[in-house]
Amino acid sequence: MNPITDWTFYAVAVPAVLLLGISKSGFGAGFGSLAVPMMALVVTVPQAAAILMPVLLVMDLLGIAAFRKDFDRRLLAFLLPWGLLGIVVGTLSFRLLQPQWVAGIVGVFTLLFLAQRLLFPPRADGAPPPRWVGALLTATSGFTSFVAHAGGPPINAYVIPLRLSPVVFTGTMAFFFFVINLAKWLPYAWLGLLDWRNLATSLVLLPLAPLGVWIGVRIARRIDQQLFYRFVYLGMLLTGVKLLWDAVA
């Protein structure tokens, strides 16, 4: 098992993994979707996704440990079946899709959601999104998570309007993405995306996982709710622009 040794790969992969860890803690949620596009500067998108798989699972476990009492059980029970459905769709269509197409769709959707939130801010007493919207967005999250580890923007578009506290938001997302990422292992292996070289490279990057999550957890537990969601929006903005750029470049 010989990992990647090219220093240019690690010059990009190290900050990408740290950014992913900070995002997994809940602080700056949405920034994590930049990890695969960043690593795609030095390796292919499928290889970047495969390398990040074990790292993501460790980060999810750390997030669950940090927020194990802070999650919405009823919301999670609603989200998980739809997210898993998205993985099934992603598995069946993976070889038919160009990653650029998916990146473009997610990028446009993310920017439209942000524009709607900024131009028409929700009222404090406004009704939450209907459940059919949640089902559609969560299935989309499972799909985009499978093909590009970019599941954050779609599910954020549903969960953010629910106005959860930062801690409950973070805990719920940690549990959701742990199940989603765990469910991706078998399809990834079936599609031939996992190999010993990628797994060895994952082991090299693994020590960065707790560092990124630790930084994000400390910030998330101390930040004001309004400021927290501003960082979420900023992360989604950068993600949307980068994904759209990847689609047209």
Question: How should these model regions be labeled?
Answer:
Residues 71-118:
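Glycine/small-residue-rich loop that forms an oxyanion/phosphate-binding "nest" at active or ligand-binding sites
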Residues 60-70, 105-130, 217-218, 238-249:
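Transmembrane helix exit motif
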Residues 56, 83-87, 110, 177, ...:
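Residue-level recognition of pore/gate-forming positions within transmembrane alpha-helices
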Residues 214-237:
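Interfacial loop-to-transmembrane junctions
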